[in-house]
Amino acid sequence: MSLPQGSDYHGNGKLYFKTHKENDMKYDICDYKDIIETHKDFPIEGIEYLDLNPIYKNPIYRDALVSDCMGKIVDMIPPTFDYIGVVESRGFLVGSILAHLLDKGLLLLRSKPGRLPGETKKISHTLEYGDSQMEVQTGKGRVLIFDDVLATGGTSQAATDVLTMGGYTPIGALFPVELTFLNPTLSIPYESVIKY
């Protein structure tokens, strides 16, 4: 995978941009945390929301994040999995790009029942700010779970459980962002790119 013109190397939660100044190469470093925006009291009072949209809006930042996620997948697990299970809806964007680049199937984990046809399994779970449900179409195969943020681990554990109920084998999970101060727990191995 190649990055758009103007970027060179990235990794370890930082972006490195190549610039030309008097025919000498210089690298400008930008931390992902400088790009991600925080919004207090969203979606409810007392929650500080991390907004990854500034990364998604910029093709260089987005492609750098995708590349860092690819590196984590290669480091974390063998390439013998069938699907990337993307959690609605913020996992859909980068997760679908990863599935395309890795030539893997895309498995949708929907947050509201009734959005998937055919035989499904669903589970209720608790979020940091309320209750939710998750639903998946039944099937078979090995699944890498992808969501944008790992907070307490409740959503990811629900994804693990509903996939198992649906006949799949969850083999790991990947997150662009992990909120380590919330001490997330998950019953399967996981990796993250940016740690708070």
Give a label for each model feature:
Residues D147-T160:
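Acidic, divalent-metal-coordinating active-site segment for phosphoryl/phosphodiester hydrolysis
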Residues P79-E88:
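Short glycine-rich phosphate-binding loop at a beta-alpha junction
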Residues K104-L144:
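Short, glycine/charge-rich flexible loops or terminal/linker lids adjacent to PRPP-binding catalytic cores
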Residues D82, G141, I171:
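Conserved acidic residues
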Residues Y9, D28-I29, D34, Q157-Y196:
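PRPP-dependent phosphoribosyltransferase catalytic core
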Residues G13-T80, G139:
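Active-site-facing substrate-recognition patch
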